[in-house]
Amino acid sequence: MQTLETTSKSNPGEVKAQKPSTRRTKVGKACDSCRRRKIKCNGLKPCPSCTIYGCECTYTDAKSTKNLKSNDAGKSKPTGRVSKNKETTRVDKDIRKLEQQYVPINANIHVGPRFPSENILNGYPQCGAPQNNVVGNPLAVNTQCHRGLSETPMSSTFKESNLRDDRLLQSSDTDDMRNGDSEERDLKGSDSENVKSKDNKSDPLIIYKDDTHIESTVNKLTQAVNELKSLQNAPSSIKSSIDAIELQLRNILDNWKPEVDFEKAKINESATTKSLETNLLRNKYTNHVHLTRFRIWIDYKNANKNNHFMGECGFSLAESFFASNQPLVDELFGLYSQVEAFSLQGLGYCVHLYEPYMKTEEAIKLMKETLYIILRFIDICVHHINEESISIANPLETYLRKKHLMPMTPTPRSSYGSPQSASTKSLVSKIIERIPQPFIESVTNVSSLQLLDLRDDESKMFGTLLNMCKSIRRKFDSVMSDYDSIVTEKSEGEQNDGKVTVAEFTSLCEAEEMLLALCYNYYNLTLYSFFEFGTNIEYMEHLLLLLEEQLALDEYYGFEKVLNVAVANAKKMGFHRWEFYVGYEESTAEKRRLLWWKLYNYEKASTMKKGFFSVIDDATVNCLLPKIFRNFGYLDRVEFLENIQKPMDLSVFSDVPISVLCKYGELALTIVTSEFHEKFLYADRYTSIRNSAKPPTLKNQLIKEIVDGIAYTETSYEAIRKQTAKLWDIALGKVTKDKINKEDTAAASKFTLSYEYHRFRLINMADNLIARLMVKPKSDWLISVMKGHLNRLYEHWKVMNEIILSMDNDYSIATTFEYYAPSCLCLATQTFLIVRNMEMDDVKMMVAVYKRFLNLGMFLQSAKVCSLADSHTFRDFSRSFSFITIISRLMIIEFMQIKELTKVEFIEKFSEVCPDLADLPPMLLDPNSCLYFSLLQQIKKSGFTLSFKKILEDARMMDFNYDRNLDSEAIKKCNGEFSKSMPSCTNVSDTTTAVSDNSAKKKASMGSARVNSTDTLTASPLSGLRNQTQLDSKDSVPSLEAYTPIDSVSDVPTGEINVPFPPVYNQNGLDQQTTYNLGTLDEFVNKGDLNELYNSLWGDLFSDVYL
């Protein structure tokens, strides 16, 4: 590198040999553009400044430059730096020093091509010429093409840019750069969890190639930017240097990725049984990788080497965790589920957070009771889903057996070939004849005789049955909105006033179940039918009606199956592409559009709710939006996303009917949220498996891009709220509701809750993604951002409570469960435990909302409708009611523990501030109260409870086999004793190894609080649900004898029960004669010392929680 002194000597005739002259001579080598702007130039062509400004980089001949300077000498003073005789300030000296230090770095920077600056959410830009606004807008940082910044391969890009050249790392003569190694260590130490960074070549367990050159380059550039930014009153030339260095950092982020050493990978294949994906998470920067907030992977091998999680026996306790041998992501909870806290990992995380508050025996008992109730709840959920899977596979037989109208014998899956089949036709007739008439005919205008005449016409029968279901559902909603209208008998004056008798209401519910069974039967019959041109649209309308009915009944399993069929058919028919609309009449085209966007809304909402990836790729959807969107100036999805944030005349929304405005708002929210999902939550840029092996600085840059994406999406949400302001006025009671019918009021309230839920879920899911990229120690900026996110969750929850308490009837509140309950769970397990303490006003609000749910719950348990307890509608509401009961209990316990109140003290305080609700907290805190009645009834064991004993055995065997102080004979002896002591979970502490003793000491503060029945939620891990997909490929379905109705036995079992093992759970590898029972609540709470099992399942997995 040419020094300043040699430069001045090479031009002795131009100016005196002093530093100002040297500076001016160096400017003579600048390009014309930099000279014109009076900024630094490195002499390259093109130079970084011209690249940034997007202008042509030209250089004037040296002689002409010299002549120009000579001619201008008498007209103006020299433009060089301050002479030696003039004093300079400290800032000027610092600036000069840094310029000398980092200009050589800029000279070696390879400035790759940049794309035009545009927002990340506007899609992937095409390669183009550099623009002058690359640096500026925070979102513009993320405008690069995610699939590569240039067409040059990554390796060649960095060869050309000389990133491996020592000159780039040692380009300064200053002491600071000479001591760069120590500064580099300091920088890495502050960013990478205090895990000593080492060469990948030195660790045989890491299968990535060495990235020291990239790591050093990133650290040098980051340090340069930080020092330049720390200067006060810096001139524009410094800003130009900062922009150039940040551009290079982004270039590295966009183009470089950790390279896999496939030779190492082959060697490691024989050394481990773990998947290659698991091994690819191992890297030199961190021993922990969060797939989500709750799902944490630990590098046990490197943890051992760094003495992390080392037990007194000399081996890694973490390696014996049950959780370490299970997939982190299970099929029930998906990747971004809102109820992830009820998974195996989630429960461990929550128990860890509650641990500091579990200081008394009462607190421990409350927590164990809660975990027992949660386990029972999950068992019931799996039981219901199993019933649904059987119902849709064999709908006619299932219904008739349930009503004891068929022998309870195993029957192979029906062979649906023709409705003329004698057996199928007979079963259809048998169900039709049981439909309660003439009441159902008065509701649907269809008689049983008409159904018998249509039974051979599959398509017409399917459509007729679905329309009947729609009419019955509308009648049911009307009755339930004022359930006081259900009377024992009608008087003469009540014949036409909208009231119904108990018998009529019972007929309504029973008829809906019969019709649903018939609908499933004809769905199976028409599934593989060929429809002539023109009739396929009618079939799609039928599928949409079936989906509506399943949503109303919360048919989890059946809805997913029908939805997949409907989406596949719609895409095959080209509903999502404009090309398939050319030539249609506009009326037909609009019908197709409405069907597609309704299906799109269903599919996106379902996958978002469950945490799954959508099967609809937005990049392939280019059909026009429905008419309501076009009326507002949005032609298609892309145009809507581009213009939603632009100012517009909001008066155009004032005359839109409420029902239409609700549909517009729902689809608008779905489109905006889906865009965020595809650009961030599932984008390879942020979820690539290689991200775990990237330097912390690059991870932090990705986090900043996600935070910017959240802010942009929230701005779109705010725009939608302004457009739908009329609905908010209705929901919050700012408009006289007498002028609006009940249906519109309920629709407005439901939409506003949906809006708050979208805002809630956006933050929650984005935080899960951020957790994957976080490094330790967390910066103050990141901690501030995450706390802000969690506080915003609280604000959205408060708005939800206000909306619910403003609703007219309890039944309408019950229909909002899908939005409210998951939000409460996230709040209870995150915000109130991490960033803010719950106050009494929060408890009052939660109990007041619960009271509204409870009113309907008490009605369902009344003598009027107790005979309907096993119907679809009431069973599903009972499940929802149980969930909200558990959440309310959790929040009360959380408040008690944070405020250090006993149960008696809390009840007294609550009674003083809220006497009208004083009767509810004692019931919520008493697990034997009527609120938990449905959870404590007997059901046959699901995959959770059946696998629980196996988990206990495996966890204990792990500890024995890893204990180096036990010889093989001792192990055999202990194993024999252990197998004798395992009749139930209440005897898990009889034989404890030295290892588990040591583990228990670490958790001594919890006493016997480690209630590990939580593992049954995902234990093996979700065997019941994982086999659901196998139903379609097998020749038979599980026998109905394997299941017992929930209400068939009133007493909770107290001992072991020999239960036939359902084929659905065979993949667990459990003995089919395995029996296990949770026992009674008292046994579980009073006899179960599960401290050791907590350590076996989770150990120190949550020693470093997310925030």
Swiss-Prot record:
This is Transcription factor PDR1. Changing residue 927 to S: Gain-of-function mutation leading to increased PDR1 activity and fluconazole resistance. It comes from Candida glabrata (strain ATCC 2001 / BCRC 20586 / JCM 3761 / NBRC 0622 / NRRL Y-65 / CBS 138). Changing residue 584 to C: Gain-of-function mutation leading to increased PDR1 activity and fluconazole resistance. Residues 175-204 have a biased composition (Basic and acidic residues). Changing residue 391 to L: Gain-of-function mutation leading to increased PDR1 activity and fluconazole resistance. It comes from the Eukaryota. Changing residue 1099 to D: Gain-of-function mutation leading to increased PDR1 activity and fluconazole resistance. It is found in: Nucleus. Residues 968-1107 are annotated as: Activation domain (AD). A motif (9aaTAD) lies at residues 1091-1099. Residues 1-296 are annotated as: DNA-binding domain (DBD). GO terms for cellular component: cytosol; fungal biofilm matrix; nucleus. The keyword Transcription regulation applies. Residues 31-57 bind DNA. Residues 542-616 are annotated as: Middle homology region (MHR). The identification of PDR1 inhibitors or loss-of-function mutations enhancing activities of antimycotics may be useful for the development of novel strategies to combat fungal infections caused by the multidrug-resistant C.glabrata strains. Residues 1-27, 66-89, 149-204, 999-1022 are annotated as: Disordered. Keywords: DNA-binding, Metal-binding, Nucleus, Transcription, Transcription regulation, Virulence, Zinc.
